[in-house]
Amino acid sequence: MEKKLIFGHKNPDTDSICSALVYADLKTKLGANVEPVRLGVISSETAFVLNYFQVKEPRLVETVANEVNEVILVDHNERQQSANDIEQVQVVEVIDHHRIANFETSNPLYFRAEPVGCTTTILKKMYKENGVDIPKEMAGLMLSAIISDTLLLKSPTCTEQDVAAAHELAEIAGVNLEAYGLDMLKAGADLSDKTIEQLLTLDAKEFQMGNAKVEIAQVNAVDVNDVLARQGELEAAMNASIAEKALDLFVFVVTDILNNDSVAIALGSATQAVEKAYQVTLVDNKAVLKGVVSRKKQIVPVLTDTFQAL
């Protein structure tokens, strides 16, 4: 049986890494020949999770077509967020919870996308559907991904399914949901040792919005001012990315995990889209986005609609 690789998006977050590991566990138990891999560096938050549950990180790959003919995507479907040579392989499965865009295949596939807060909420259901018991460490990974994607069940992306799954998985994993969740988020929000490049690439995604090419990077922080103190350096690096990638807009979002607000730094030729979308005025290239914590639900669709109306 020919091996398939399972991976999440570039600049992987906790859900991307954990979903690849978890789905590989389930598929292997169902008799498939698969390997979880990653398309980028693991974040401090994800490192905390893997260390806590004693799970080895997936292997890093730059390309996939040199290894396999078929791949499985988790936590993404848009081509520009996937492996650089994704066009050279056949996508046979997708498990995701994001919008579907820039995606087509020449062959039929298994495509499962649900409007939930996290990919592992879907994967938990798939264990049950296939009659496979969830191991303690896999429960821990699934729980961690839900905590990460929903900011400990506080994000507007969080659904009743995510809440129910989190409580059940916490019990299987043997952890206190609130205490573990806060420790995990704080580990991810410690940005003191991060370089400017790391801050901008830890959790960054590119999107096509109408005719505009947009990149949105996001970090979680306990004190947003620690990050904003480096605004000059951040803007220099953002402008370099805009020139290199021919971006129309680069938005860097710093989310306060304690107060559930964000500050956005916006650069590029299309910053008026941010002002129009959120009814704000950028002062010194930045604005407070009250109550905004989710890129998926509160930034991407809002900006997409704004660009299409421009």
From Swiss-Prot:
Gene3D superfamilies: DHHA2 domain (3.10.310.20), inorganic pyrophosphatase (n-terminal core) (3.90.1640.10). Mn(2+) 1 binds at residues 9, 13, 75. It is found in: Cytoplasm. Binds 2 manganese ions per subunit. Its cofactor is Mn(2+). It is an enzyme of class 3 (hydrolase). The keyword Hydrolase applies. Mn(2+) 2 binds at residues 15, 75, 97, 149. Keywords: Cytoplasm, Hydrolase, Manganese, Metal-binding. It catalyses: diphosphate + H2O = 2 phosphate + H(+). This is Probable manganese-dependent inorganic pyrophosphatase. The lineage of its organism: Bacteria, Bacillati, Bacillota, Bacilli, Bacillales. The gene is ppaC.
